[in-house]
């Protein structure tokens, strides 16, 4: 399973990766351990709460479509889908080994940057890869709750004062800090950073500067909405087995 954590485009990246994998012939299950917005492009949604046999429900859906969204139940008050428990995801991934599971494991209140609270992220098991997403549009914004989710925790991780601007060093600190974006990520799990919204002015320069300060993981920058990315670190291309062209990682 692959988990997406952080802020600034997790859901968009998840669905973009899913489309790419489905186009390549894979069977893909998009899901969450928290809450997500329903897909906008007509992907089938499988509701597991109350299902007599959740494994059969997902299996049958994948037999009819290469990519599906698995969720607990609709949440009409917030126009989202409720998540699936890590325990159920373990059951599903074991029973459906041919499927690729993409799991949004974090919430960010639609902010471009965050630090996890004590109960976050809600990671599934077994976890093979964890992708931390940061929004490059956060750079230059003040570290306050109007612009950053859990800004006090970001300040603590980055050693900055409240209200000070987000910098590339802030992003690097969130990646490297033990209580940062990869909090509770298991040993042996591959760790990648996707710096999203790289189409903005100066965004790729900011991402490159952050990657240079954070050498323990592979960094990519790009635009999930536009469907491209570039590797920023020497290990990034090797980590994802991709050529250095403007495309989403697989």
Where are the regions that the model predicts?
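Short, ordered loop/turn segments at secondary-structure junctions
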Residues: 7-8, 33-36, 106-107, 135, ...
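A generic structural motif
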Residues: 32-33, 217-229
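N-terminal phosphate/diphosphate-binding loop that engages ATP/GTP or pyrophosphate donors
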Residues: 11, 18-73
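N-terminal glycine-/serine-/threonine-rich phosphate-binding loop
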Residues: 1-17
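Short amphipathic alpha-helix with an adjacent loop that forms part of the alpha/beta core around
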Residues: 55-62, 240-248
């Amino acid at each position: 399973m692959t988990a997406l954590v952080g802020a600034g485009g997790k859901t968009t990246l998840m669905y973009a990766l899913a489309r790419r994998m489905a186009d390549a012939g894979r069977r893909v299950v998009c899901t969450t351990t928290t809450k997500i917005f329903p897909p906008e492009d007509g992907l089938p949604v499988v509701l597991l709460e109350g299902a007599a046999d959740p494994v059969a429900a997902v299996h049958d859906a994948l037999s009819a479509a290469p990519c599906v969204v698995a969720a607990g139940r609709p949440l009409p008050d917030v126009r989202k889908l409720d998540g699936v428990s890590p325990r159920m995801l373990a059951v599903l991934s074991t029973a459906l080994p041919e499927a690729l599971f993409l799991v949004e494991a974090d919430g960010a209140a639609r902010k471009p940057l965050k630090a996890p609270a004590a109960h976050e992220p809600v990671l599934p098991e077994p976890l093979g890869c964890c992708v931390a997403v940061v929004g490059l549009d956060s750079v230059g914004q003040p570290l306050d709750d109007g612009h950053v989710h859990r800004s006090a925790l970001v300040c603590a991780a980055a050693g900055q004062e409240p209200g000070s601007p987000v910098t590339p060093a802030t992003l690097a600190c969130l990646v490297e800090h033990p209580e940062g974006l990869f909090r509770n990520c298991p040993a042996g799990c591959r760790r990648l950073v996707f710096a999203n919204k790289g189409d903005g002015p100066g965004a790729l320069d900011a991402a490159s500067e952050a990657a240079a300060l954070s050498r323990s993981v592979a960094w990519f920058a790009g635009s999930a909405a536009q469907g491209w990315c570039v590797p920023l670190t020497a290990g990034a291309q090797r980590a994802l087995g991709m050529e250095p062209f403007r495309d989403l990682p697989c």
